[in-house]
Each structure stands twice: as structure tokens, then as C-alpha cells.
């Protein structure tokens, strides 16, 4: 790294896809805050036209609390001026050729100006429709690469993936690119990405010919995605399609420098722009909130498994540092796994104790205003034991309530429906999170560790006071969860 990240960002023109997503917004806010002399940020969002894209960015990004530090520092007028001068909203869709941009003049101008392409666009639904997952996570990534190749000044494509592209492998998981020719399942079945697309198209055609409803088509396309993922050794459609996206990028990058960022479970900001900002319930957050509300009393978890989390601002810092390091490099194909399991692990057993401590002292309130009392969550280490426990402890009593409902419908009907809904919610969470809560892998992050060390040297040399720190060892997990992350969820997600 020959100069600081702040200097690197100066006068750069950067394209960011998926710009209304959680991580992309943290990334964009950081750039605007630390380097207002960035030349231009082209922000691609799905919208009918550029006017709609502008409105969507304003309401879903710039008016959010995330930008309050910039707003407080600059004032409304100066912030609006900065945004109008530096940000260009672009209506687009990476699932389409030319990123779905209809304005050819704008597209040509972008391809003359852009220095760095950052692909953050993704669908993160674990059980996404296979056609949508392939369209965005797999071939959408290839569309971004093809666009980047047409940018005459392009110095780098930075692609955000996920650490869980590894599948369900145990042990130390290498920080290296996929080699497509080596990808086959335990029975030796070779993965053919083009065949996967053809299978998806054929199934979609069959469903259309059968006159299947939209709801039915969604169901069957979700089933197909999960079926194909598990056949090839991945737990769900999300990580399977993200894996194939990485493979296509590696195979088709040619001479364009390529950096792949693989974050683990992204959580609320640790420091910047302020502690605790988050949007939506992400991965373990659904479990945290359900527990705090008294809905979740038991869960499928190995108490000794590591919960690999990383704050969003650390991921954004790693993205900027990686771009500054590799932009313009020859034949670069670098992978950075950004997580905490290797250097600063926390196990689910510790998290259970922290959650019990927090919600005992900071009880949430029910709809009628009463305080919700939580007990220590029961953690069950296997799916078979969990299913047995749920049947004996909850399902059989609920069936008795159903019988009462039939005999005395006005008496216990609401209680039966309420309890049944809670059971369904728990089982849905368990099925979605099973591959992660029983995960036995640790993510090797030597590349990221070396990058972080170099970044700290640069920050020291340039008196930037660790402005781009992403060292997981600085996270004090108990303090972070109790004083930052859970309060952030309650403030920014539950709006309480």
C-alpha cells in the first residue's frame, strides 16, 4: 500500500451496485465522510428510472440515521450540496445485460470515467427462488464483471461475497479462490453452472406451460434451488448461487484485477459512523429478538460452536483497504475472509449467557405494556433431539388445545393459534439456521490479517488514527453485545 486510503479515494470515480443495501450504505457513507473529494459515486439501485432511483436513495439511504454524523458535521445544506455534486443515482438491475441501464449516453459516460467497480448487490434469502438467485448472485456477478471490462480506466473489481461459500466443511477454511474444475460433490458429480441455468429455465418453462400460479411457481423454484444446492454440497440456495458467482468471476476476469471480500455474519457498526447502527434482522438477530420477546425459549445450537460475527464498519474498512492495495495490480485475484472466528472467537454458549444477562436487566415490553420475563435459553445440540423436544414439550400440548378449540371454539381458539404460530416460527428459524448454528469451520484470515497490519502502519504514518481499522481482536464481545449491538437492534430495528 503506497499511500493512505484517504489519498487513494481522492478524485476516484466509483461504481457501487446494490447501493440501498445495509453494507453498501455503510461503505458509501464512510467514503463521503472521510474523503469528500472523491470524484464521483455512481450508485446503482433497482428503480423504474433515474428519478425513481434518486428518490429511493434519498428515502432509503441519505435520510436514514446512518447519515446523521455527516448531517451534523456539514449541516443539511452542505450535505445536500455534497450529495448532488458527488452522487449519481443510476436505475439498473445487475440481473440484466448492461446492468439494466436504459440510458446509453449515461452508460458510455460511466464507462469512460469509472476507476473502481464495487459489487455489493445480492439476494440474501437463504431459500431464494432459484431463478432469482442465479440471476442476481451468479450471472448478475458476471454482468458486473462484463460491465467493468468495458470501463477503460477500470483498475479493479471488488466483489462482496460471503464466507459461507465454503458450504458445510469443518476445520480451517482456506482464504483462496475457487477453482471451478475442482468443484464436485462427495459422489464426484461435477458442477456445471451453465447446466444449472438450463435446468432452471426448463423447470420454469414447465411450470408456465402447466399454468402454475405465481405462488406455486415461487414454491417450486425455491424447492429447486434448495435441491440443487444440497445435491452439490451447499446448505442453501443463497450460498450456492454466491459460490457460483465467485467461480464465474474467477474464470472470466482476464486481466482485470479482482478482489473478493468474504464477510461472515455482518452485525451492527462497532464505531462508525456511530456504534450500533443496523438495518433489518440479520442472521442471529432474529434469534436475539425472538428470545427477548419471550417467543424463543429453546433453539438448535451446539454451545461450543463458534458464532462468527463481524461489525459492518469493519467490513467497509476492509473493502476500502483492499481496493487501495490492489487497484491497478496485474493479474490480481485476491480473497479476503473478514470475520472473527480465527483471531477472536465467541461461542454460542457465551452468547446465551450474555443474552440472558441483557434481557433480565433490560426487559422488553409486550403489546399490553407488561414486562417480558426471559429464562435462560435451552440449547439442544442435534436436530433429532430438538425435534423430539419440540414434540413432547410443545406440539402435543398444542394439539390438546386444538381439541379444546373444536369443542369450545370461543374459549381457547386464540391461545391455540398463538402457540401454533410460535412453534411454526421456531421451526422455520431452526431449519434456516441449522447449517450455521452447528457449523464446525473456522475461517482462515491470514490475508486479511496481513492487510490489516499494513493498514495500521499506513494509518500511523499518515496520522489517520486507525481510521480504517478492521482488526477483530479489538472487539470486546460482551461489551459490544450488551452496550452496542442489542441496543442498536432495539433502537433501529424495533424502533423502541
From Swiss-Prot:
Reactions mediated catalytically: a long-chain fatty acyl-CoA + 2 NADPH + 2 H(+) = a long-chain primary fatty alcohol + 2 NADP(+) + CoA
Taxonomic source organism: Arabidopsis thaliana
Similarity-based family: Belongs to the fatty acyl-CoA reductase family.
Keyword Calcium set for record: no
Function (record text): Catalyzes the reduction of fatty acyl-CoA to fatty alcohols. Catalyzes specifically the formation of C16:0 fatty alcohol.
Record-given protein name: Fatty acyl-CoA reductase 8
Keyword Oxidoreductase: yes
One Pfam family from the record: NAD_binding_4
One of the GO BP terms on file: lipid metabolic process
InterPro entries: FAR, FAR_C, Far_NAD-bd, NAD(P)-bd_dom_sf
Effect ascribed to mutating residue 377 to V: Catalyzes the formation of C18:0 fatty alcohol instead of C16:0
Result of changing residue 347 to T: Increases protein stability and enzymatic activity. Catalyzes the formation of C18:0 fatty alcohol instead of C16:0
UniProt-listed Enzyme Commission number(s): 1.2.1.84
Gene name of this polypeptide: FAR8
